[in-house]
């Protein structure tokens, strides 16, 4: 019995051990599976955590590279050009410009009537006051513009050459400017002999422009253009009957004589015959030149002319007009605008009444309307007039249309006091110079100034129907011309209901449009 019990216990113990062994294998398998699962999950988690980290790391590495690429792609700022002494008359801080004006004492000494305000300094300040405005605003591209007053005696041509030497050699200016009066004969001293830019407010001959195309600029058309266009306009409007004989009162000054030559060619091509009398205006002897002009009246009459073209400046034409008044010849007269101030309000105020009804072909405007009344300023002209009265307190804030330059308190028959008209040429020239100097670059040269000038078009005061334009091959600013008639108006004339003084804007001689039509200069 006992043996059976022992055997039974042995069997039970064996089963227990087998069961324990089996349980241990299952646990190991489960533990291994769980461990593998946990390991896989951990690896996936690590991969999931590592992926963004790697992407962030890659992005962090790529971002500076991209920023560097972007920085490399952006254009670098232009280096600031330093101002240098880029040309004669230009330093790092200044530009020197010669303002060439007449020493009016010479005219006063011979008894030529000049208004009290019209002084030598006044003439130069019409330009230099604009320099003051530019300088107060910071200058031209940071440079101060310095005006150098240079004078000449209008009755002594040799002093004009001295003015050139003083400007170009003694002062070594960047450029020279003259609004009116300088004898064209001496312009090549600046432009050709000394390679200096010369800006002229009147008529520069084409032959001189061709000799120095990047140094000579003007407001008015060249003598050749004025003579040709003037003669063509006279012919086209039938002012001179076909087949007439035309006299040409010219000058031995080549710059003025070129207009006579051009007019002669047009007239002869149109079937007219011509005869020319040349006055010596280069001697500096005003009395002798006027005597020659006076003698020409009888000579033209003797040669049987029907019409005379007058090309002389008014300062040398007084003898001619005086003799016309004395002899009252039957032939008509036309003035060509090829000389200083011929067809300006100032010129009209100083021209002999014997020139009454003479025709002038000019690029200058006229305040008088051929329909009566007085024209108003356009916007640019109004600005010029305001600047003028601001510059010169002597005029007490008042400037009147058509009143001769420099007049102060000109009393009318009605007791009204009138003051000088503003100088339109100087205003236009200052406007153009400021643009060209600015556009010539931080370090301007005479060549860059010329290139800048030739690109300008815009307003023009009291000329060319209010507009102007230079061009690649056009060194004069005016683009249009018109025919005007000389009107004699005594200073005791009262202002009419239309605001004019017998057709003139002031009680003084003036120019009145013949038709009011402007003609483009080809």
Where are these regions (language model features)?
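Sec-dependent bacterial lipoprotein signal peptides
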Residues: 1-20
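Bacterial lipoprotein signal-peptidase II cleavage site
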Residues: 19, 23-35, 39
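N-terminal extracellular/periplasmic Venus flytrap/periplasmic-binding protein-like
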Residues: 62, 68, 72-166
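Solvent-exposed, acidic/polar segments of extracytosolic/periplasmic ligand-binding ectodomains
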Residues: 75-84, 88, 356, 457-522
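Beta-alpha junction/loop-to-helix N-cap segments that form part of ligand/metal-binding clefts
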Residues: 121-125, 136-213, 219, 281-291, ...
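Extracytoplasmic ligand/sensor domains, especially the bilobed periplasmic-binding protein
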Residues: 173-278, 284, 332-361, 366-368
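Extracellular/periplasmic periplasmic-binding protein-like sensory domains
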Residues: 324-427, 514-518
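Segments of small-molecule ligand-sensing domains
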Residues: 401-424, 434-496
